[in-house]
């Protein structure tokens, strides 16, 4: 039936998942973080409630990755903040996102 279709995989912004997200800030630099409530976290960045991005607004959500395991999300966030992780991020996901 038409209304019975279900998507497989993670549902966008579902509280059962942990999210690693990448923002582009007004200074054309990136910010990488992780959270379980992506909508709330992005809203907090946009309001200026997050010290790391408060003076770098407006922000734009560039991409996010969903993980069912918190530790995997945290490890991926840490990796993206390393030199090799940033190089992969810049090469594979974006034309240019600096630190």
Name each model feature, range by range:
Residues 1-50, 57, 64-82, 86, ...:
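GIY-YIG nuclease catalytic motif and its immediate N-terminal context
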């Amino acid at each position: 039936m038409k209304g019975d279709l279900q998507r497989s995989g993670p549902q966008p912004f579902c509280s059962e998942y942990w999210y690693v997200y990448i923002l582009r800030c007004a200074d054309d630099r990136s910010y990488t973080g992780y959270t379980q409530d992506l909508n709330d976290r992005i809203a907090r960045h946009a309001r200026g409630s997050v010290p790391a991005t408060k003076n770098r607004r407006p922000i734009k959500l560039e991409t996010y990755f969903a993980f069912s395991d918190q530790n995997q999300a945290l490890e991926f966030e840490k990796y993206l903040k390393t030199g090799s992780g940033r190089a992969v991020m810049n090469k594979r996901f974006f034309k240019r996102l600096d630190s």
